[in-house]
């Protein structure tokens, strides 16, 4: 089971992961199953060696939980086998859609409507039934707000999770990015109203500032102070401290800087003075 603070596994960082010291703050890794289901060769051997040392969380990119196309059962079965192979007990994916007659290669927003709540929750239940375990859904960054919305973002997230009986994967950077870009829901209001009992996993990441009113969720920069403050607030609001992962996808600094950010997560967890829960 995963617990405490972790770092997303990227092939560019393989040698660094293989060289982790015993006192490294990195307690688990996360990988996108789509990147590994058909991967072999040296890259897979490195991944396997790291996954033998550290617990693994799986975070999907293409389940298209809110999409209209039929669910990809081959993908779900592949994820189930990967979870079995690596003794992985946690899987999450985005509350979005990414298929429309083919892969769209982006995570597109869903309209916050009752109809979409029922549609998405039904599909999540199908995924859970096929996987044989509970999953978690992540709040995504979005750049176009649907005029069809009947509720705000956190109400939609709560409603889907409640109807599907799934966990909530909270991305604090996405909360901040959406608050700045749309001005519809403050980060504080989001955290005050999220179903805290369902929050079982957290992401934190950096973003790019295009203009003061436009932030882009890139995972290509260090976490900014405003987002660290939001993580601290999240820990204060939640009954227990979920496993929390630092996402970094490119523009990699020296690995010691990434470890320092993971250590900062661990420090915030300790200062919160609450039980650290396991995600399963």
UniProtKB/Swiss-Prot annotation:
InterPro entries: MbnB/TglH/ChrH (IPR007801), Xyl_isomerase-like_sf (IPR036237). It comes from the Bacteria. SUPFAM superfamilies: Xylose isomerase-like. Pfam families: MbnB_TglH_ChrH. Coiled coil: none annotated. Belongs to the UPF0276 family. This is UPF0276 protein NMB2142. It comes from Neisseria meningitidis serogroup B (strain ATCC BAA-335 / MC58).
């Amino acid at each position: 089971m995963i617990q405490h603070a972790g770092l997303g596994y990227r092939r560019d960082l393989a040698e660094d992961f293989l060289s982790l010291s015993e006192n490294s703050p990195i307690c688990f890794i996360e990988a996108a199953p789509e990147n590994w289901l058909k991967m072999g060769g040296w890259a897979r051997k490195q991944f396997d060696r790291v996954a033998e040392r550290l617990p693994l969380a799986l975070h999907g990119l293409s389940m298209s939980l809110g999409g209209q196309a039929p669910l990809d059962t081959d993908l779900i079965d592949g994820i189930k086998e990967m979870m079995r192979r690596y003794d992985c007990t946690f899987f999450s994916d985005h509350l979005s859609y990414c298929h429309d007659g083919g892969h769209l290669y982006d995570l597109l927003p869903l309209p916050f409507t009752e109809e979409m709540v029922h549609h998405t929750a039904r599909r999540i239940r199908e995924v859970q039934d096929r996987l044989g375990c509970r999953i978690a859904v992540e709040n995504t960054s979005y750049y176009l707000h649907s005029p069809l919305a009947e509720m705000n973002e956190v109400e939609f997230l709560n409603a889907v999770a409640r109807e599907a009986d799934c966990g909530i994967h909270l991305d604090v950077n996405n909360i901040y990015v959406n608050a700045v870009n749309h001005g519809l829901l403050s980060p504080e209001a989001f955290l005050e109203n999220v179903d805290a009992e369902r929050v079982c996993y957290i992401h934190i990441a950096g973003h790019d500032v295009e203009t003061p009113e436009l932030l882009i969720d890139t995972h290509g920069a260090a976490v900014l102070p405003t987002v660290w403050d939001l993580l601290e607030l999240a820990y204060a609001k939640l009954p227990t401290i979920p496993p929390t992962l630092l996402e970094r996808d490119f523009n990699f600094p020296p690995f010691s800087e990434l470890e320092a950010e993971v250590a900062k997560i661990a420090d915030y967890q300790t200062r919160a003075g609450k039980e650290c829960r396991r995600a399963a």
